[in-house]
Amino acid sequence: SVTVTPNNVNIPCNGCTTLTATVQGSVATTSYSVAPTAYTPYSFTGGTPILVNIDDTWSGVITLPFCFQFYGQTYTQCVIGSNAIVSFDLANANMYNTWPISAAIPTNTVGDMMNCIMGPWHDIDPGVAGSISWAIYGTAPCRAFVVSWNVVPMFSCNNLKLFRY
């Protein structure tokens, strides 16, 4: 079973566990619509490798080939964290990707959590196995910037119960 306390999540390494999440609140917008789509994932392999064999760090700055609108802001660059997080705060580039999370979420005070898209954002360890890469799929105006954390094990759970996002 998964054990959750205010500052810790313990996931067992001896079998499969299904994780679900409930999103609380959102920012209203007049320009986005949400609709269900069929599950057709992009490739988990290929792309441009980053953070090869490095745990708990942010990538260098990655320039997007298009403008990305996120909560009313326009971004053209990002950084990717080894713990399944993408940030538009370029001050994080090549820095420590904070773990553990010591602040409540949501927060307006912790830099790692500002202006970011979180996968599950948890402590995974690409220093042991797996890969992190990014790629652009599609053609304008329907392009996608895709980041893959492929078969990366959980930190301190190196028997390779793997994570793919």
Task: Mark where each language-model region is.
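Proline- and Ser/Thr-rich low-complexity, intrinsically disordered segments
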Residues: 1-43
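Von Willebrand factor type D
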Residues: 28-165
